[in-house]
Amino acid sequence: AGFAGDDAPRAVFPSIVGRPRRTGVMVGMGQKDAYVGDEAQSKRGILTLKYPIEHGIVSNWDDMKKIWHHTFYNELRVAPEEHPVLLTEAPPNPKANREKMTQIMFETFNAPAMYVAIQAVLSLYASGRTTGIVLDSGDGVSHTVPIYEGYALPHAILRLDLAGRDLTDHLMKILTERGYSFTTTAEREIVRDVKEKLAYIALDYEQELETAKTSSSMEKSYELPDGQVITIGAERFRCPEVLFQPSMIGMEAAGIHETTYNSIMKCDVDIRKDLYGNIVLSGGTTMFPGIADRMSKEITALAPSSMKIKVVAPPERKYSVWIGGSILASLSTFQQ
């Protein structure tokens, strides 16, 4: 969250609401009935954590209100009734959800004006394009969204319920095979950090596995909060490989490369060339080193042989949805 015209968000925190497991555990600590974001994260040992956004769609409005309240009053320190608001939504956001968001902004927060933009479209704007296909992959959901002259093509949008959280879960599982144990919500956050710091995508998965068997060059160590040091090797690339092979976690779905290709194939034949040449990655789950090269290799194998394929991975892509929103909201034409 932040202000239109800024080049980076002022506040970045996980959309988590935590409630104390037992009342009275923290007597005299001025215990709150709910904690949001980083504070919920840091006190997770005594809290039950809830994620009000599931697969990119809000599923718990009371908790979502808490998150928005925290954003306005504690993070940005603004009076919401004094600022127009731009919110973003995942592409297949049900109409009822958009209406509910609008209602809460006007009735609970008294916003003077609001607009809801599609996340992937904002990422494309942030990359300086108006035509292209965006693969947007966050924590709970991934989408491929073809966009032509600034408009998302709804019939060709595909959703993949495979994203960061699933990769973290998979890493927890394969680290267990190594004899480490991670099970609680608190431990999941540690594994997420391991994933973000050490995982990468292999250009050739089978070959990488062979290399891992014979050499220890890819082994890295990671110090846990309690001081214990764990070693992670092939897990580093086995974890995000799931994006290309969802069957590894028992999902009957096409990988991100094939989903992108399928999305392009749902578009008019005349615009496919523009889409193949402008494949834009966005969201935290596209931050793995090696993802652009692998994506390019896989799509080249699927596309017509003469087709020019370009995969763009902007360095700021973790926040490109926000940056696109900042650009859009600061245009004078938009404000009218």
From Swiss-Prot:
Query: What is the annotated localization of this protein?
Result: Cytoplasm, Cytoskeleton
Molecular function terms from GO: ATP binding; hydrolase activity
Q: What does this protein do?
A: Actins are highly conserved proteins that are involved in various types of cell motility and are ubiquitously expressed in all eukaryotic cells. Essential component of cell cytoskeleton; plays an important role in cytoplasmic streaming, cell shape determination, cell division, organelle movement and extension growth.
**SUPFAM superfamilies named among the record's database cross-references:** Actin-like ATPase domain
Cellular component GO terms held in the UniProt record: actin cytoskeleton; cytoplasm
> For this UniProt entry, what is the primary localization, expressed as one broad class?
cytoplasm
Q: What else is known?
A: There are at least 7 different actin genes in tobacco.
Q: What EC designation does it have?
A: 3.6.4.-
Could you list this entry's UniProt keywords, alphabetically sorted: ATP-binding, Cytoplasm, Cytoskeleton, Hydrolase, Nucleotide-binding
Kindly provide the name given to this protein in its UniProt entry.
Answer: Actin-93
Disulfide cysteine pairs (residue numbers): none
What is catalyzed by this enzyme?
ATP + H2O = ADP + phosphate + H(+)
Q: List the lineage, top down.
A: Eukaryota, Viridiplantae, Streptophyta, Embryophyta, Tracheophyta
InterPro entries noted in UniProt: Actin, Actin/actin-like_CS, Actin_CS, ATPase_NBD
- SMART domains from the entry? ACTIN
Q: Which family does it belong to?
A: Belongs to the actin family.
* A Pfam family of this chain: Actin
